[in-house]
Amino acid sequence: QLVGVVGKDFPDDLVQTMRGRGIDCDGLEVADGPTFHWEGRYTDDLTSRTSLKTELGVFADFDPKIPEKFRSTPFVMLGNIAPELQIAVLDQVKSPKLVVADTMNFWIDGARPALEKLLKRVDVLVINEEEARQLTGKHHMIQVAAKLLEMGPKTAVIKQGEYGAWLFAGQHVFNAPAFLLEAVDPTGAGVSFAGGFLGYVARAGN
């Protein structure tokens, strides 16, 4: 089940591809205006990036409306959008079992109060190492994780690109290495990881 907004410039064949894979796109709104656009420059080792341009497009005026048939979903993945919108989505869902949220430097810098409010309502925060340090003001990984959990989430997943990811939950710590692949463009890799993480948890039912 997908909820979001795109502009009329968004290719319909991509929507049909998602539908063809069993994704219910009834929550996808097509609005007048351009689709969200981001540009960035990656370091040579692809482990960090500099945002060059963030154009919200139709996201700037997006008011998410969750279809009634979506509202009882047990698992919610709050994708990387404005924290105010993530909260608006969460307000419309009925008692989910697990809420996972993603965020990025743009929102940490520009919408921190709303982000801090959101973090008190999510179960799992998925965030990359650089942004975790930015959000917490800490550097050492143990201190970073402790601060993240103090902000609200029960679990923090800190992504480290080609080095895998760390999961922190209370006194539990788990490290998962990455499969080494030739990276062509890492844009969206973190979001795909977060979605795959929640998809597996939902399928496992644990």
Predicted regions mapped to residue ranges:
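Structural beta-sheet core signal
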Residues: L2-G4, A101, I158
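Conserved N-terminal subdomain of the carbohydrate kinase-like
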Residues: L2-M77, D91-P96
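A structural micro-motif
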Residues: I23-D26, P96-L98, V122, K154, ...
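Short, acidic/turn-prone active-site loops that include or flank metal/cofactor-
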Residues: V30-D32, T103-W107, E130, F179-E182
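Acidic, amphipathic alpha-helical patches
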Residues: I66, L115, A183
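Structured loop/turn residues at beta-strand edges in well-structured enzyme cores
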Residues: R71, K120, M151
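Conserved beta-alpha-beta core of the PfkB/ribokinase-like small-molecule kinase fold
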Residues: F75-A146, G164-A165
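Conserved phosphate-binding/catalytic region of the ribokinase-like
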Residues: H139-N206
